[in-house]
Regions:
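A short beta-strand-turn-helix
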Residues: 42-59, 84
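Short clusters of hydrophobic/aromatic residues that line enzyme substrate/ligand-binding pockets
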Residues: 50-52, 133, 196
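Ser/Thr/Pro/Gly-rich low-complexity linker/stalk segments immediately outside membranes or between
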Residues: 26-40
Length: 216
């Protein structure tokens, strides 16, 4: 009996120690991420990035995303819902972070579509049909391009812009900013320059609503 009590006591102590250590680690990570964003506030958002919502909205959600990312596709309608729920108060800005193999060519398509004012229709189409142009977490650019051909878009201009220096520079800047901010996975969200340190849709909503309460 004494051995059983000793075993249980030891297990409880170890469990509590693990929980405490995990909490401390999470707190340290959150502090680090916030300090990193504060020290590099000028690279979180970039003028000219695709955006949706009122231009004068006081709340800006910046999303570093990969079009081949399944979680990004799942969050796409959820972020749209936030913008609709708070009209005029919230906008979203998209930053390219092509982590998946082959995604670099797909983000070039999106940026080329952006030059024609078709970024959002293109992104919606790609996310809605993501399983058709990705294989085992690898993007298939040819299939993605074929899909985008169904849009009312200048296809020849799209293909020209895809490989242009202008598009390449935008993507390079986004990737460099993501590296500076130590974005390691997508989607990564920032709300008014502050990182979402605990990932989740409910956590994102809470952060946005807190920002709205402060701004309005």
């Amino acid at each position: 009996m004494n051995k059983k009590i000793l075993f249980l006591s030891t297990a409880v102590i170890l469990s509590l120690a693990f929980v405490a250590a995990t909490s401390i680690f999470q707190a340290q990570q959150e502090t680090k991420e916030n300090e990193l964003a504060n020290n590099n506030a000028d690279v979180v958002s970039r003028s000219g990035s695709p955006s949706k919502g009122a231009a004068d909205a006081k709340i800006t959600i910046v999303e570093f995303f990969d079009p081949a990312c399944e979680t990004c596709a799942q969050f796409y309608p959820l972020v749209n819902d936030i913008i609709k729920k708070y009209p005029g108060k919230v906008k979203v800005e998209m930053r390219h972070t092509p982590f998946h193999k082959g995604a670099d060519k797909v983000v070039a398509m999106l940026e080329a579509a952006h030059l024609q004012g078709k970024f959002w229709p293109a992104l919606k189409l790609l996310f809605a049909n993501q399983q058709g142009w990705t294989r085992h977490h690898t993007a298939q650019p040819e299939q993605a391009l074929q899909l985008l051909s169904s849009l009312a878009i200048d296809k020849q201009q799209l293909q020209t812009d895809m490989v242009s220096e202008k598009v390449a520079n935008v993507i390079s800047q986004d990737v460099a900013d993501a590296k500076t901010l130590e974005v390691r996975a997508t989607p990564q969200f920032f709300v008014n320059g502050k990182p979402l340190t605990r990932f989740g849709y409910r956590e994102l909503i809470d952060m946005v609503e807190d920002a709205i309460a402060l701004a309005y």
